[in-house]
């Protein structure tokens, strides 16, 4: 069965993301573990740059925090296109909880960051982000 992430935004709106658990199994497992534990609930998309990315998943709300551990990159053939979900990091193998969704193709990030999903519904809500947009909940479902 395939997995999806459902990000419900405070104030309405749901972003549905197909997860690439065959291409990035450890990254998807980490994201699922954090989501299932409620880690992302109440966190924000702290970095929103139109035409580039919307980044979230920092418990400090500033881009400086994480879950207290790091995970290895799982570079794969998937490209950074509009709607791509990928892990943010401060250097190879330093990802943890922060992720981003691309607003437009970002080929300079291909082969550098782990792509682990793609928005399939609700990209219009991501397009409306202004910064500090709150994730009410993140749930992983099997479809």
Summary of predicted features, one role per range:
Residues 1-143:
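Cyclophilin-like peptidyl-prolyl cis-trans isomerases
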């Amino acid at each position: 069965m395939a997995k999806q992430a459902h990000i419900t935004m405070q104030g309405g709106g749901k972003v549905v993301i197909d997860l690439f658990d065959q291409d990035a199994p450890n990254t998807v497992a980490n994201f699922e573990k954090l989501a299932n534990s409620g880690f992302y609930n109440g966190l924000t998309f702290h970095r929103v740059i139109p035409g580039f990315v919307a980044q979230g998943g920092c418990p400090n709300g500033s881009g400086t925090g994480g879950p207290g551990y790091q995970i290895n990159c799982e570079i794969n053939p998937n490209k950074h296109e509009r709607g791509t979900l990928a892990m943010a990091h401060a250097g190879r193998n330093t990802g943890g909880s922060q992720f981003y969704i691309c607003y437009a193709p970002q080929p300079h990030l291909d082969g550098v960051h782990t792509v682990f999903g793609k928005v399939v519904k609700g990209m219009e809500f991501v397009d409306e982000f202004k910064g500090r947009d709150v994730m009410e909940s993140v749930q992983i479902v099997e479809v």
